[in-house]
């Protein structure tokens, strides 16, 4: 096996492993495992690198470096896809069996697949995710209700200098508050929010189609050319015959590895749709679940307090060096009252039985809300 081919395979495998750890390492099934800890280290390294880049950018490049560097990943993605397509048409296509090359269906579907990947990438990259401005903030604020558990009334974005509606979040990369914020996608250098979630899902599905159909065509090409080397295994045919077979093998391996990641990631988002949460909200609900596991989350019953839920914690009373049980606000962590104040509380024992996600309207309606949304501004 030649060194370049070895390097390519190692890079592909390492990239797939790292991407999988970052995407799925935060799953409850991986908590307190080496995978979860490695994910934290990767994110910490990423945070330190970004902090260093921001420092250099602000002191040397006048805050322009971060803006332009955000386009490196989308540019890399487009270059890789374009290069792979070039390799396919110059080295793989001629190896395809005649029933594929002479088929009007396959010719049309190849064109359709390429068209979809570039259109969905363009739309996911450049469409408005749902930027909140002074002109539309009132409409957005009235669209989603605060549940006083993960979203709170009268929250204020100090950067945008506007109120922060429920289900929104300020993106430090885009420097905008985004309606129904899901996450910032580095692959398209854009936030995924209320208006462009449909294009993001289209981007994922287009990639699954490209990888799945591309893998099928590469397998057909390998099966066709394998007849010329009956004494060699598929692996030997890939690494020791000619450049066309090597390119076909590399593309097939890429498709097999990355379609699994794309399918799992798309399945994760379908699960979020089923649960009626966004990626951002899933993290918030995880914090709520953690409080429940500690026995620290309580619902306020029959009180004049402007709080629906509070967190129990123990603090030290420095006046007499004793410890005191108090209840703090989930919104700002201010101490609201102590256990001796006689406030009527109900302990939250279970996420499923004691809490209601007011944003979950059922899978079909959740899907309609994200895919067929109405324009507010």
Curated annotation (Swiss-Prot):
- Which residue windows are transmembrane per the record? 5-25, 65-85, 104-124, 199-219, 250-270
What spans does the record annotate as topological domain Cytoplasmic, numbered to this chain? 26-64, 125-198, 271-377
Lineage, highest ranks first: Eukaryota, Fungi, Dikarya, Ascomycota, Saccharomycotina
Question: What name is this protein filed under?
Answer: Palmitoyltransferase SWF1
Note the PANTHER family from the entry.
PALMITOYLTRANSFERASE SWF1, ZINC FINGER DHHC DOMAIN CONTAINING PROTEIN
What this chain does, per the entry, is described as: Palmitoyltransferase that targets several endosomal SNAREs. Palmitoylates the SNAREs at cysteine residues close to the cytoplasmic end of their transmembrane domain. May have a role in the cellular quality control of transmembrane domain-containing proteins.
Q: What is its main location?
A: endoplasmic reticulum
Q: Which GO terms describe its cellular component?
A: endoplasmic reticulum membrane; Golgi apparatus
Where does this protein reside within or beyond the cell? Endoplasmic reticulum membrane
How does the UniProt record describe the way this protein sits in the membrane?
Multi-pass membrane protein
**Family that this chain belongs to:** Belongs to the DHHC palmitoyltransferase family. SWF1 subfamily.
Recorded source organism is Debaryomyces hansenii (strain ATCC 36239 / CBS 767 / BCRC 21394 / JCM 1990 / NBRC 0083 / IGC 2968) (Yeast)
Coiled coil location? none
Disulphides: none
Q: Which gene encodes it?
A: SWF1
So what EC number does this one have?
A: 2.3.1.225
Which reaction(s) does its UniProt entry say it catalyses?
A: L-cysteinyl-[protein] + hexadecanoyl-CoA = S-hexadecanoyl-L-cysteinyl-[protein] + CoA
Q: Where is the DHHC domain?
A: 155-205
- Domain remark in the UniProt entry: The DHHC domain is required for palmitoyltransferase activity.
Q: Which UniProt keywords apply?
A: Acyltransferase, Endoplasmic reticulum, Lipoprotein, Membrane, Palmitate, Transferase, Transmembrane, Transmembrane helix
């Amino acid at each position: 096996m030649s060194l370049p081919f070895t390097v390519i395979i190692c890079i592909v495998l390492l990239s797939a492993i790292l991407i999988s750890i970052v995407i799925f390492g935060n799953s409850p099934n991986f908590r307190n495992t080496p995978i979860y800890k490695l994910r934290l280290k990767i994110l910490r390294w990423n945070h330190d690198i970004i902090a260093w880049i921001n420092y250099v950018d602000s002191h040397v490049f006048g805050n322009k470096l971060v803006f332009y560097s955000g386009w490196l990943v989308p540019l890399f993605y487009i270059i890789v896809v374009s290069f792979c397509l070039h390799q396919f048409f110059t080295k793989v296509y001629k190896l395809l069996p005649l029933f594929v090359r002479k088929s009007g269906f396959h010719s049309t579907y190849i064109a359709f697949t390429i068209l979809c990947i570039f259109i969905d990438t363009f739309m996911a990259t450049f469409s408005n995710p749902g930027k909140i401005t002074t002109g539309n903030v009132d409409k957005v604020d009235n669209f989603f209700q605060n549940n006083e558990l993960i979203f709170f009334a009268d929250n204020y974005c100090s950067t945008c200098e506007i109120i922060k509606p429920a289900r929104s979040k300020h993106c430090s990369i885009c420097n905008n508050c985004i309606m129904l914020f899901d996450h910032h996608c580095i692959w398209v250098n854009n936030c995924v929010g209320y208006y462009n979630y449909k294009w993001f899902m289209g981007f994922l599905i287009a990639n699954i189609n490209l990888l799945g159909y591309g893998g099928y065509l590469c397998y057909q090409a390998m099966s066709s050319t394998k007849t010329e080397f009956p004494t060699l295994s598929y692996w030997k045919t890939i690494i020791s015959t000619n450049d066309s077979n090597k390119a076909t093998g590399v593309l097939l391996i890429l498709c097999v590895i990355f379609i699994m990641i794309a399918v799992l990631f798309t399945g994760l988002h379908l699960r979020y749709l089923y649960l009626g949460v966004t990626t951002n909200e899933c993290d918030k609900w995880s914090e709520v679940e953690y409080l429940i596991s500690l026995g620290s989350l309580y619902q306020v019953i029959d009180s004049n307090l402007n709080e629906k839920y509070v967190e129990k914690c123990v603090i030290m009373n420095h006046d007499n060096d004793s410890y005191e049980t108090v209840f703090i606000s989930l919104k700002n962590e201010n101490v609201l009252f102590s256990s001796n104040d006689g406030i009527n509380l109900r302990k939250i024992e279970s996420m499923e039985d004691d809490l209601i996600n007011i944003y979950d309207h059922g899978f079909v309606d959740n899907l309609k809300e994200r895919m067929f949304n109405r324009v507010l501004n």
